[in-house]
């Protein structure tokens, strides 16, 4: 009888496409469905999803007519307690929280995690039930009317989401593309600036929506148009688009002031600009075939230096900060800024070599990415 020996194999690793199954490391997976590598070792089941805002972002729920269309959501960002979203030509906001205790279908005081961002009275949505309320504290909604608008009262478990409906911010962002955005605070108020590649960049502080067009009464100077990338850096707002080599910036602490005498200006690089990202007190300028970095504090000492003139970024929506570095999609795969600075365009700088076969199949329409920090994950989504 043959001797049988036990061997402990640690299950870890991820998808490996550049090796055949016989030469892959022991414990690596050949096929995973709804599983992911765990930062604690081995594999874990991918968590399910839950709606953050219960109502769909559409004309019916926004009170608009033929404005949102049926295409994809173009923006999803959080500002304070609000979710800011865009679809079609409409920009809107909503707020959500969750129950912190079980509730029966008849209670009229609802205990939640936080009521910040909610009006002092209004309408809530939980499951398929509509609830109105007349008051609130920091963690409760009071005077609730259950089963409003002919909906059916229901009981809810702890952690179930409860949200407002959508409130329209603007409906005139014609022909908008997918948005880039930056959060900033120049004057003691948290704001978000958004750019869609077709309309003027705009800012929003939770209450006031302003076009950054340099117009009389809200700003000055000649504002950039059809901006695709926007980023706040050193108390200036920076604007760029892929059809131009020009990087425009506002006056300090004034995102809608484009007057050179007040400190606004522009910088030209030798390549079409794809995207922007601030990292370690420097502004990285990702171009089609090169990458530059801007340092300094104002127009008096801004300096632009090349990171590489031999390789660029394919899509602005691939740029993310993770693990103390910037990652972006280059022609030869996913790269880090640190690796690119160190060894320029050498192929060894790619971090996606083991899945290059999958990277080569990427379609660059509707590409986007996100970082899941608690899992140390960079996720790239593409059709």
Predicted regions and their residues:
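N-terminal beta-propeller domains
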Residues: 1-94, 166-170, 219-292, 377, ...
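Residue-level signal for WD-repeat beta-propeller blades
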Residues: 77-78, 84-85, 104, 117-118, ...
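Surface-exposed loop/turn positions within WD40 beta-propeller blades
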Residues: 80-81, 88-89, 189, 197-198, ...
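Surface-exposed loop/turn elements that mediate protein-protein interactions on large endomembrane-trafficking
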Residues: 86, 90-93, 166-167, 201-214, ...
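Small/polar beta-strand repeat architecture
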Residues: 94-108, 113-179
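Short coil/turn segments at the loop-to-beta-strand junctions that recur within blades
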Residues: 172-178, 216-220, 225, 309-314, ...
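Hydrophobic or amphipathic alpha-helical targeting/insertion segments
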Residues: 180-216
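Beta-sheet-dominated scaffold domains
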Residues: 235-236, 270-383
